[in-house]
Amino acid sequence: MMTNRELLINAARAGEIAGKYYIAYGERDVNEGIDIGGGRLWNPLINNADAFSLMVRLYLDLDVRDYGILVNSPDTGVRYKQLVARGEDREKATRLAIVNCAAIIGENL
């Protein structure tokens, strides 16, 4: 299992997102992502638009089921399944599945 840092760096590599990993600790939260300039952090783990863009950029197939999220990369053969328990945040699980699939692709580049 990869850390958030590894997930973000490898997913960015797969998606050809240029930037450096950045993390800052606040009083109540952690602000992390890939610094893509202009004061913007790219973080598909928490941002639906970033996750969707990554999915489209990598031509990933997404299959949402009641038990989990399946992400498949036809170009590379990489597949990832994120199980989802009843009542769990399905959008968060979907973002996590997309990022994990992309990170596996990026790790192998």
State where each predicted segment sits.
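Glycine-rich anion-binding surface patch
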Residues: 1-109
